UniProtKB/Swiss-Prot annotation:
Cofactor note: Binds 1 [4Fe-4S] cluster per subunit.
Sequence similarity: Belongs to the aconitase/IPM isomerase family.
Protein name: Homoaconitase, mitochondrial
Location of the transit peptide in the chain: 1-28
This protein's encoding gene: lysA
Length: 769
């Protein structure tokens, strides 16, 4: 047991409270720090007392950096409202990017009766996914998108110019301190430049085009602290591959991440490393990956401004860098850079000691499998194809790292660049034309071509399983891209690994999974140090008065919250003044029999088969028939109209297909209850007027009662959702117990979208009004 100081009474007497010992630092456990790092002299100092009072008042609405940025782009807020995690807000993002899916979005846009863009300056269109496809059908789609963009006066980038996310960053559309969205899951990339980048779905995009806004629920925010210094031979790709594999229990699923660290630590992560890390926070399960507005970012921005001012960014394709990157704008940006408030609340805190990291490889066929390169090298894994492609790792610096592998080998080969290994095919595609031109100017692009690499146009290509060079059955591939799940880059019978550009190049050169040998482990190294908390050892923590008191307040808040949870009744169903307003046309109560599908991570392909996804005009009856058929072919006959579907955790993960929601509506299921939802499924559900609730307790109770697993089960239980009271009532069979449980509030602005029949109809109604 240890003593902690607690304030008591109006005069703030200090009393001692006996609490259990808590480890100050251990992996995957709380590392909240004890009160003994607040010295009594600090508490007795009159100036400290005044500071203590000011800190109390300033902590009324402390916000994370994510919340601060969202606050800037939230519209229609009540006066004095400070947004926080969990809030449903209407957002008017700084920019929105669509790519090859621009035409389906345009069809939605026109179907709701929209005739002009709300704000053409808000919109950017890029063609990047299927750029190798020269069929007339695809070229016609590309022409339609370009004509539509010209008609509405929006920024347009043609096929071959580069990958949309790279364009958004290099052209300055993703700008520090802004909220930027895209109809693509790797919108997280923009977090590298201190922009909250997050994905939306096509209906959202049509809504923003037409009205300038859509809805968003602010995710829980996780703080990830980097400590130490990234060693030579270790890259940003190794950092994010390690994070995905070492924190592999959905630690940040559906969270917004804020990366932080000391100035020295963050200097060891250059901008291209940050772009890689932010990009793959998507694979880690997060909805955004935000880096701070710091000196590294400022230096990069000023470099872009200088390059643009000198005209060095000019080339065969247009660039807006000279307009968007200017030294006065950058200086103004950093006069008062946005930072998280002291006392901001985070849903969780994790840390990774960069100095203990070595080169890592992801796979095969899963980002949750991360293995030190050294272990895989010992296995002599033959490689058939290598890929230096994608918005993750195909910038000029990445191409330079890959070229250095061959240049180093050339020094041992009489100056002659060696060829890639027999039987290996090596594909390269720059993230954008400016990046390729920079690589050509340095001679790095030519080095890779001389080694035998096959150049592909700037675009997504093999990363998403399109075009030349896909993996065949039985083949092994190593890629610098971001996803390696089975079948992503070709055959489901192939094995795909992910690694840094130098690992890709070294593997292409040797013919087996290997690295260039640039990394040397430090003396005494044993393992990667990571865990919960901020990872700073107490003996290294120097606290001034303000830091100490700020820490104390945070600990008091946590202690009070823990006490409230510990001594509060198990269920507190009704609170005075806590009733939710019900929007006209939205049901006050929803009730039905529970059908239970006892499975976690049911993806959208399990809900609505891919075979039907790209077939137009599928009858509603057919959608109902195939709903959940990839999960359980008996679902169609077991589930009935009006049933309430209860499922496990992370329901609706995977692709962004809207039919995963509309097929359940076709089956006439009004409400889905889960332990948790995949974020994109949640968006599609609300956008298509399918109601959903997250109730982990109900999932646990069903699993307790029905231990013998069935894919789909009629339970005989009933669920009634009281929308006004934000509670559910469960009747466990005719003669079983009845219990109630509080659920998250569904606010009127979201009810309105559902009551109108979905976001498209809501937008149409808004346009007509």
């Amino acid at each position: 047991m240890q003593s902690r100081l607690l304030p008591s009474g109006p005069g703030r007497r200090w009393i001692s409270l006996r609490v259990p010992n808590t480890p100050q630092r251990r992996a995957f456990a709380s590392t909240r720090f004890l009160f003994q790092d607040v010295f009594q002299s600090q508490l007795d100092d009159p100036s400290s007392a005044a500071l203590f009072s000011s800190l109390q008042s300033s902590r009324a609405v402390p916000q994370t950096l994510t919340e601060k940025i969202v606050q800037k782009y939230a519209v229609g807020l009540p006066d004095g409202k400070f947004v926080k995690s969990g809030d449903y807000v209407t957002i008017a993002p700084h920019r929105i990017m669509t790519h090859d899916n621009s035409w389906p979005v345009a069809l939605k846009f026109m179907s709701i009766g929209a005739s002009k863009m709300h704000d053409p300056n808000q919109v950017v269109m890029t063609l990047d996914h299927d750029v190798q496809n020269k069929t007339e059908k695809n070229l016609q789609k590309y022409r339609q998108i370009e004509e539509f963009a010209k008609q509405h006066g929006v920024e347009f980038y043609p096929a071959g110019r580069g990958i949309g996310h790279q364009i958004m960053v290099e052209e300055g559309f993703a700008w520090p301190g802004t909220l930027v969205v895209a109809s693509d899951s790797h919108s997280n990339t923009y977090g590298a430049v201190a922009s909250v980048g997050t994905p939306i779905v096509r209906t959202d995009a049509a809504s923003i085009w037409a009205t300038g806004k859509t809805w968003w629920q602010i995710p829980p925010v996780a703080k990830v602290t980097f400590t130490g210094i990234l060693p030579p031979g270790v890259t940003g790709k190794d950092v994010i591959v390690a994070l995905c594999g070492l924190f592999d229990k959905d630690d940040v699923l559906n969270h917004a991440i804020e990366f932080t660290g000391s100035e020295e630590t963050m200097r060891s992560l250059p901008m291209d490393s940050r772009l890689t890390i932010a990009n793959m926070t998507t694979e880690w399960g997060a909805l955004s990956g935000l880096f701070p507005m710091d000196g590294v970012l400022k230096g990069w921005l000023k470099g872009k401004a200088t390059t643009a001012a000198m005209g060095l960014a000019d080339g065969p394709f247009k660039t807006l860098a000279a307009r968007n990157f200017t030294h006065p704008a950058i200086e103004q940006l950093f006069v008062n850079p946005l930072t998280a408030d002291k006392g901001a609340k985070y849903a969780k805190e994790l840390f990774l000691d960069l100095s203990t990291l070595s080169p890592y490889v992801s796979g095969p066929n899963s980002v949750k499998i991360a293995t030190p390169l050294k272990e895989l090298e010992a296995q002599d894994i033959k490689v058939d194809k290598a890929y230096l492609v994608s918005c993750t790792n195909s910038r000029a610096s990445d191409i330079a790292a890959a070229a250095k592998v061959f240049k180093d080998a050339a020094e041992k080969n009489g100056g002659k660049v060696p060829k890639i290994a027999d039987g290996v095919k090596f594909y390269i595609a720059a993230a954008s034309i400016p990046e390729q031109l920079a690589a050509e100017g340095a001679g790095d692009w030519q080095t890779l071509l001389e080694a035998g690499a096959t150049a592909l146009p700037a675009g997504c290509g093999p990363c998403i399983g399109l075009g030349t060079g896909l993996l065949e059955p039985g083949e092994v591939g190593i890629s610098a891209s971001n996803r390696n799940f089975k079948g992503r880059m070709g055959s489901t019978e192939a094995k795909a690994y992910l690694g840094s550009p130098e690992i890709v190049a070294a593997s292409a050169l040797s013919g087996k999974l290997s690295g260039p040998g640039w990394y040397q482990p430090p003396e005494g190294w044993t393992e990667v140090v990571r865990g919960e908390g901020d990872g700073i050892r107490e003996e290294d923590r120097m606290l001034n008065t303000e830091q100490a008191l700020e820490k104390l307040l945070g600990q008091l808040d946590d202690l009070v919250a823990d006490g409230e949870k510990r001594f509060a009744p198990e269920e507190k169903v009704e609170e005075e003044g806590g009733l939710t307003e019900v929007y006209p046309g939205f049901p006050e109560r929803v009730s039905g029999e529970i059908v239970f599908c006892d499975a976690d991570n049911l993806n959208t392909d399990a809900i609505y088969p891919g075979y039907w996804t790209y077939q137009d005009n599928v009858p509603v009856e057919k959608m109902a028939e195939v709903c959940m058929s990839n999960y359980d072919k008996e679902f169609a006959s077991i589930a009935k109209e009006g049933d309430i579907l209860v499922v496990g955790y992370n329901f609706g993960c995977g692709s962004s297909r809207e039919q995963a929601a509309t097929a359940l509506l076709a089956k006439q299921i009004p409400l889905v209850v889960s332990g948790s939802f995949g974020n994109i499924f949640s968006r599609n559900s609300i956008n298509n007027a399918l109601m959903g609730l997250e109730v982990p307790r109900l999932v646990s109770r069903l699993r307790e009662e029905f231990g013998d697993k069935q894919l789909t089960r009629r339970t005989g239980w009933t669920l009634t959702w009281d929308v006004r009271r934000s509670q559910i009532e469960i009747q466990e069979g005719q003669n079983g117990p009845k219990w109630t449980h509080k659920v998250g509030e569904l606010p009127p602005n979201v009810q309105e979208i559902i009551a109108k029949g979905g976001l498209e109809k809501w937008v149409k109604n808004a346009i007509e009004a």
